[in-house]
Amino acid sequence: MCRLLGVSRSAYYDYEQRRCNCPDDLHHRQLLNAVQNIAKSCDYTYGSRRMKRALNALDYRVSRWKARRLMQEAGIQVKHRKKYKVTTDSNHPLPVFENQLNRQFTVARPDQVYVCDITCIWTQEGWLYLAVVIDLFSRKVVGWSMSSRMKTTLVCDALRMAIWLRRPPPGLIVHSDRGSQYASKAYRNLLKAYGFIGSMSRLGNCWDNAVAESFFGSLKQERCQWRHYQTRHAAQQDILQYIAVFYNNQRLHSYLDYKSPNQYEAEAAKSIKAA
């Protein structure tokens, strides 16, 4: 047969091997379709580890190796991270809080420790500044605020949103870097009014606020660096969609055993109620 076809025996066997490795069956086509849908829903940001977990959640029992092969077969390329400028201004004469957190990033319950930070996103109109408040328990973004200026009201509004949504009790630790906005009198008074405990990273040590830094890395890697925002309003709408729809509700978080923050909190609430 090989002589009739005009091909070598090794070429024929190589073709047969490739054909066997790519089965044209219903289950395989369903798997590929699921991979493509997951990749699209996460804006092509999931690597093979998260893809495996997402497929497992849909009752497809695949390994990470299998997930990688399916992604390759589907032609899916994952977006990669860039570096970004630091926005913290720690060079100020304002008083700072002691570091109460000390890199203890694991907590037992919601609304026990919040971490806060500011970043900037470029638009054709200029910089847009984003302040967030994250609950350490579930890594959920519980408060945020955006503005064209990096002023004290930016961080106060983000914390007020978290207070309004979550009603955290007195004694909550609120950690941030040493930026002047977090050291301001208005912000300190806000903490005092609700009986919260202020905490700040050590000077020049970004790892003390690693959870907030990690969120900003995900936001920019998975969304902002692939966009060309014409206006601040367009950026605000896109960031809002990322936080409220994708990150809190859908994105699989490795720290949460590949659950979304909302799913993790819901399961924790059920466990507490059943206890």
Label for each model-derived stretch:
Residues 1-275:
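Charged DNA-binding/catalytic regions of mobile-element recombinases
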